Design a protein with these regions (language model features):
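Intracellular alpha-helical coupling/juxtamembrane segments of multi-pass membrane proteins
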Residues: 250-305
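ABC ATP-binding cassette signature C-motif
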Residues: 1-260, 309, 318-518
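Post-kinase regulatory C-tail/linker adjacent to protein kinase catalytic domains
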Residues: 313-315
Length: 518
């Protein structure tokens, strides 16, 4: 049974086409992984099929009575609302139904006998619907999902305005899962989840009986939950049966076959053109030349396989730092209240340390405290001598109004435009990306612009806060290689063991030092 039909969909931004003439059907129960390099249009596609964005051409048609759940990273959580109230919002339609039923019961007190029977029947239908949807078990459902995604440790009476970005994402995801729609649309749901919560989500999606479309660059996670791959590539959307690994096998063969066909056709074209050039003027062979020219004119050209530009992240290194990188004495981190026990930490030159732990326990706060960007609650943190810092924040702090060229030029004013373009291209950005405003780029493309600044500023210490968020597979692979070859010191917050295994020399588990219940 088809629950969504997409026909002849085309869309772009200005003269930059995102996809062209895309058509497909979504069937009930399909578990789809939507993949593609940064900037291929995955999030744009999600916005179109949910009606948040109108396509330039084509139609999106949903079957009647299909409920769609989309995890919108930009959804508003109102100040003054508790986590429990936000999660209970998943059942707003049921609460409305209960209100309607109660109003009917109130009206029965003054209703005439004829009207009474009609109202009783209507209230009975509403009661049955509430029972069928487990309305009277809502609190149990909320608690179950809250435990699974680590929200209980925050306290369900906590105001949502006090949550970190990662905690907020968990609330939005929990609310979406509680609503149990006919189709789930998930855009990088693991970005702000901890290892144990990713594992719970994996099990949940594995057994999910309805359909979902999942965008994720976490390949082990993707492989474990999907049975179909939709690949956004070169303005097209292609369907592959199986998981990501199976897709890669088939796609590689497909690319090789297309390359071979392209070369054969180019050789044939060269041969035909040569024959026409040599024989079109001779009376005896003119007809044969015209015949071959007609064949050339009618030939359907095979395009050469295209691949997303491969990034190159080579960090510029400054002179060697002193032996000590950081040293803390009874450091307590936090804002209004302490987030940690007194910490006595030590980091020395050439160490590559990863900080892990649950969302909201202070990983970013620790980084900023060590760098002196925010004051400590108590204690002190000292940075060593001759430190040249490269700092990658989790999210961009700019307004995004500048073009990528101007964004880089702002930091590297001595560069020529050619040098700016070359630096951005080496980070995997195309000419269209480079000339666009930063705000219209995907999350992965924006991260590459910030990485462009980072790698070109000489450093001997890199402090990285979730650098893999939003990056596609090729970019993550290249970033890991570059960090492995980096001769300076690294302090990094990361939630992906697959990324930091073979890179980290030491792991600091902040959950062992936090004052929060986890």
């Amino acid at each position: 049974m088809s629950i969504m039909t997409v026909k002849n969909l085309s869309h772009g931004f200005g003269d930059r086409a995102i996809f062209n003439d895309v058509s497909f059907r979504l069937l009930k129960g399909e578990h789809i992984g939507l993949i593609g390099a940064n900037g291929e249009g995955k999030s744009t596609f999600m916005n179109i099929i949910t009606g948040k964005l109108m396509p330039d051409e084509g139609t999106v048609q949903w079957s009647k009575n299909v409920s769609v759940g989309y995890m919108d990273q930009h959804a508003v959580l109102k100040k003054g609302m508790t986590i429990r109230e936000a999660l209970a919002g998943a059942f707003d339609s049921l609460f409305d139904m209960e209100k309607q039923m109660n109003e009917l019961y109130e009206q029965m007190g003054s209703a005439d006998p004829d009207k009474m029977d009609e109202m009783m029947e209507e209230a009975s239908v509403l009661q049955e619907l509430l029972m069928a949807h487990d309305f009277y078990s809502i609190d149990v459902k909320v608690d179950e999902v809250a435990w699974a995604l680590g929200l209980m440790e925050l306290g369900l009476d906590t105001d949502v305005s006090a949550l970190s970005g990662g905690q907020r994402t968990k609330v939005l995801l929990a609310k979406l899962l509680l609503s149990k729609p006919d189709i789930l649309l998930l855009d990088e749901p693991t970005n702000h989840l901890d290892r144990e919560h990713i594992e719970w989500l994996r099990r949940y999606l594995e057994s999910y009986e309805n359909a979902f479309i999942l965008i994720s660059h976490d390949i082990p996670f993707l492989n474990s939950v999907v049975n179909l791959i939709y690949h956004m590539h070169n303005k097209n959307l292609d369907r592959y049966v199986g998981d990501y690994d199976k897709f890669m096998e088939v796609f590689k063969v497909k690319q090789e076959q297309q390359e071979a066909a392209y070369k054969r056709q180019q050789a044939e074209i060269a041969e035909l053109k040569d024959f026409v050039a040599r024989n079109k003027s001779r009376v005896a062979t003119r007809n044969m030349a015209m015949s071959r020219q007609k064949k050339l004119d009618n030939m359907e050209l095979i395009s050469r396989p295209t691949e997303a530009p491969e990034p190159e992240f080579d960090f510029k290194e400054s002179k060697i730092s002193g032996k000590v990188i950081f040293e803390t004495k009874d450091l307590v981190i936090g804002y209004d209240e302490p987030l940690s026990k007194p910490l006595n930490l030590y980091m020395e030159r050439k160490q590559k340390i990863v900080i892990e732990g649950a969302n909201g326990i202070g990983k970013t706060t620790l980084l900023k405290s060590l760098l002196g960007l925010i004051p400590a609650v108590s204690g002190e943190a000292k940075m060593g001598d001759s430190i040249e810092l490269g700092y990658f924040e989790q999210e961009s702090s700019g307004d995004g109004e500048k073009t990528c060229i101007d964004e880089i030029w702002q930091d590297f004013q001595a560069w020529t435009q050619f040098e700016v373009r070359l630096a951005l291209a080496k980070c995997g950005l195309t000419t269209k990306h480079i000339e666009s405003k930063v705000k219209v780029l995907s999350g992965g493309e924006q991260a590459k612009v910030r990485l462009c600044k980072l790698i070109n500023r000489p450093s001997n210490l890199l402090v990285l806060d979730e650098p893999t968020n939003h990056l596609d597979v090729a970019a993550k692979t290249e970033l890991k290689r570059a960090l492995q070859e980096y001769n300076g010191s690294i302090l990094m917050v990361c939630h992906e063991p697959e990324f930091y295994e073979g890179l980290a020399t030491e792991i600091w588990d902040l959950s062992e030092w936090t004052t929060r219940l986890i």
